[in-house]
């Protein structure tokens, strides 16, 4: 019996000595896809390097074996496999085959993450803040004062909260102007505007918008969701033009505002019309929320498949265990495809409805990604609804797209071939 135990112990020691890699599968076998991103972030933060195996088992992660890494998998409830050198080398060789649409990206440096969000309490959650917290990825909350004080270069990746960069407070005036949270939001923004010498909040928001544009031009990574996406581009197009009515800035909007818009300044959209009705819960014709006629049981969008070896950036941003993602509403739900600039890459769309849901582009040395909708795990998230409990959605395919964007800046850059 002692000999048997000795053999088993020696086998275990031998196996561990040759079990040199820890593979985190990201296909349907994974118990918690979202926490797997946080684990990978933590691993590279410890100074190790990680492989992002694009299109291999749902976009799996792999790194040299350490007992501490395995312990973290166990603590966080993440599925993993301990594999020997030979198996790892075979996987890498299979991925390198030019006949298969796979590639390996090296993740080296954890990005410094900033979330743009007001200090005043808002009656809605923010999907990115929720998933960063759940995945245990560290982030810093910043707002207009930090941006105006020049803090953006401290960060690699910036998320824009559910924000209205036009200075119209999300056009919530009609329904919520008597609510304490709305009044607090107005007061906070007016106070910051005055602090930096602006007479209108719209002027402050434009200055912030331009600072963010500089951040992207200098090599920053911008990610925005919901109303932060189209309102950002509207603010760029309306630079120097008054598009706010008196309840928002104390005087009337420029009657020629539409004709004066400059679409050459925007990231993603062109030829849109701004909403001139100050009481309408809509900013422009970019968003499909009020024009779409898609029943819930048919509300999905499909991710495009890109060449992993030739187009690694969009391939990273679309890694998922599902290619068809359940749709979800937001103040901005999706984008009319005919209003998207020709150079913008559409990564996810509802083709029958002619709407894009997930788009990407480059500006200067940086990149931006816009993702329509408010909460991937809540089909319609209303003002005042409780936050989503991601413990109930650990395998959300829609939330994975957010985390792809967080890890994307950690990748060692390869020269894009197309």
Task: Tell me the role of every PLM-derived stretch.
Residues 106-109, 150-153, 215, 339, ...:
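Extracellular/periplasmic catalytic domains that process cell-envelope and extracellular macromolecules
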Residues 182-183, 197-198, 217, 237-240, ...:
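Catalytic cores of eukaryotic secretory-pathway lumenal/extracellular enzymes that build
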Residues 2-10:
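Sec-dependent signal peptide recognition
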Residues 21-22, 27-31, 62, 66-71, ...:
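Helical hinge/lid and interdomain linker segments adjacent to catalytic or ligand-binding clefts
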Residues 126, 133, 230, 260-383:
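Catalytic beta-strand/loop cores that center a nucleophilic Ser/Cys/Thr
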Residues 19-126, 135, 373:
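Hydrophobic targeting/anchoring helices
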Residues 14-16:
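N-terminal signal peptide c-region/cleavage motif recognized by signal peptidases
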Residues 20-62, 242, 340-418:
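Extracellular ligand-binding/catalytic regions of CAZymes and related secreted enzymes
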């Amino acid at each position: 019996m002692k000999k048997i135990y000795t053999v088993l112990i020696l086998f275990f020691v031998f196996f561990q000595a040759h079990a040199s890699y820890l593979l985190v599968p990201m296909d349907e076998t994974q118990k918690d896809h979202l926490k797997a991103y946080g684990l990978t972030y933590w691993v590279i933060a410890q100074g190790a390097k990680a492989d992002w195996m694009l299109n291999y088992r749902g976009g799996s992660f792999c790194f040299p074996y350490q007992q501490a890494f395995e312990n973290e998998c166990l603590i966080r409830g993440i599925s993993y496999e301990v594999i020997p050198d030979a198996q790892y080398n075979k996987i890498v060789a299979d991925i390198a085959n030019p006949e298969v649409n796979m590639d390996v990206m090296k993740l080296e440096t954890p990005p410094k993450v900033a979330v743009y969000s007001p200090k005043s309490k808002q009656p809605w959650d923010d999907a990115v803040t929720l998933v960063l917290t759940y995945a245990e990825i560290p982030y810093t909350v910043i707002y207009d004062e930090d941006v105006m004080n020049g803090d953006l270069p401290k960060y690699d990746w910036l998320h824009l909260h559910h924000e209205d960069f036009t200075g119209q407070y999300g056009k919530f005036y009609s329904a919520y102007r008597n609510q304490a949270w709305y009044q607090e939001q107005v007061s906070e923004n007016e106070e910051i505007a005055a602090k930096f010498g602006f007479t209108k909040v719209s002027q402050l928001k434009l200055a912030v918008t331009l600072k963010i544009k500089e951040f992207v031009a200098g090599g920053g990574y911008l990610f925005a969701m919901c109303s932060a996406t189209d309102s950002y581009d509207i603010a760029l197009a309306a630079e120097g033009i008054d598009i706010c009515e008196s309840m928002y800035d104390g005087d009337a909007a420029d009657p020629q505002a539409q004709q004066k818009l400059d679409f050459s300044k925007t990231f993603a959209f062109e030829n849109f019309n701004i909403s001139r009705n100050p009481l309408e819960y809509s900013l422009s014709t970019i968003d499909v929320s009020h024009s779409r006629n898609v029943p819930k049981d048919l509300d999905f969008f499909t991710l495009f498949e890109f060449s992993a070896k030739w187009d690694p950036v969009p391939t990273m941003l679309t890694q998922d265990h599902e290619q068809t993602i359940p749709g979800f509403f937001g103040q901005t739900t999706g984008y009319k495809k005919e209003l998207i600039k020709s150079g913008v890459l559409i990564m996810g769309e509802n083709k029958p409805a002619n709407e894009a849901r997930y788009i990407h582009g480059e500006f200067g040395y940086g990149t931006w990604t816009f993702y329509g909708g408010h909460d991937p795990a809540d089909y319609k998230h209303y003002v005042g609804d409780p936050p989503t409990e991601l413990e109930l959605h650990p395998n959300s395919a829609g939330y994975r797209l957010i985390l792809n964007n967080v890890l994307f800046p950690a990748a060692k850059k390869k020269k894009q071939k197309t």
